[in-house]
Amino acid sequence: MARYLGPKLKLSRREGTDLFLKSGVRAIDTKCKIEQPPGQHGARKPRLSDYGVQLREKQKVRRIYGVLERQFRNYYKEAARLKGNTGANLLQLLEGRLDNVVYRMGFGATRAESRQLVSHKAIMVNGRVVNIASYQVSPNDVVSIREKAKKQSRVKAALELAEQREKPTWLEVDAVKMEGVFKRIPERTDLSADINEHLIVELYSK
């Protein structure tokens, strides 16, 4: 399955919620009719079956983290193998992706931009360049911007935007040095309450 390259707001409208695919701190509902699906008949909100609701939730989470279908299914399988709650495990695995950590630390304005920084070899983990977006960051790992990338205007702009967002408690970031520490794996209570991971577990359990 190819990565979606179309309008980002269209995806958020499809899911009926802000997927945080655009940079900035202005609420997305001031930019478009977020509650109305895209298309000519968007105002007619279809009534979904249980399966439809589960599928929409899976698509929403997959799009938030920018993960392709096969990758997402593999994350679910890994989450199911781990001890504890499968849904919480799934979200923790997604949060541990390097591109997501770079975004959470404020080095990229969006997850897509953060993924690009990683693929362009602008990110280091524990002093070594890592260019794999899906790399799993471990507790106490130090994530930093490579020296020659620190002058990039997009990195500076992203850090300014990050100052206006709530800072994740599981990360420690030094904006001046452009580096941060992944202190711990986030608890489920640390993450968005707008995600209903139980629906995803129900979908894949069938």
Curated annotation (Swiss-Prot):
<dbReference type="GO" id="GO:0006412">
    <property type="term" value="P:translation"/>
</dbReference>
<comment type="similarity">
    <text>Belongs to the universal ribosomal protein uS4 family.</text>
</comment>
<dbReference type="GO" id="GO:0015935">
    <property type="term" value="C:small ribosomal subunit"/>
</dbReference>
<comment type="subunit">
    <text>Part of the 30S ribosomal subunit. Contacts protein S5. The interaction surface between S4 and S5 is involved in control of translational fidelity.</text>
</comment>
<keyword id="KW-0687">Ribonucleoprotein</keyword>
<dbReference type="GO" id="GO:0019843">
    <property type="term" value="F:rRNA binding"/>
</dbReference>
<comment type="function">
    <text>With S5 and S12 plays an important role in translational accuracy.</text>
</comment>
<dbReference type="GO" id="GO:0003735">
    <property type="term" value="F:structural constituent of ribosome"/>
</dbReference>
<keyword id="KW-0694">RNA-binding</keyword>
<dbReference type="InterPro" id="IPR036986">
    <property type="entry name" value="S4_RNA-bd_sf"/>
</dbReference>
<comment type="function">
    <text>One of the primary rRNA binding proteins, it binds directly to 16S rRNA where it nucleates assembly of the body of the 30S subunit.</text>
</comment>
<dbReference type="InterPro" id="IPR018079">
    <property type="entry name" value="Ribosomal_uS4_CS"/>
</dbReference>
<keyword id="KW-0699">rRNA-binding</keyword>
<protein>
    <recommendedName>
        <fullName>Small ribosomal subunit protein uS4</fullName>
    </recommendedName>
</protein>
<dbReference type="InterPro" id="IPR001912">
    <property type="entry name" value="Ribosomal_uS4_N"/>
</dbReference>
<dbReference type="InterPro" id="IPR022801">
    <property type="entry name" value="Ribosomal_uS4"/>
</dbReference>
<dbReference type="InterPro" id="IPR002942">
    <property type="entry name" value="S4_RNA-bd"/>
</dbReference>
<dbReference type="Pfam" id="PF00163">
    <property type="entry name" value="Ribosomal_S4"/>
</dbReference>
<keyword id="KW-0689">Ribosomal protein</keyword>
<dbReference type="InterPro" id="IPR005709">
    <property type="entry name" value="Ribosomal_uS4_bac-type"/>
</dbReference>
<dbReference type="GO" id="GO:0042274">
    <property type="term" value="P:ribosomal small subunit biogenesis"/>
</dbReference>
<feature type="domain" description="S4 RNA-binding">
    <location>
        <begin position="96"/>
        <end position="156"/>
    </location>
</feature>
<dbReference type="Pfam" id="PF01479">
    <property type="entry name" value="S4"/>
</dbReference>
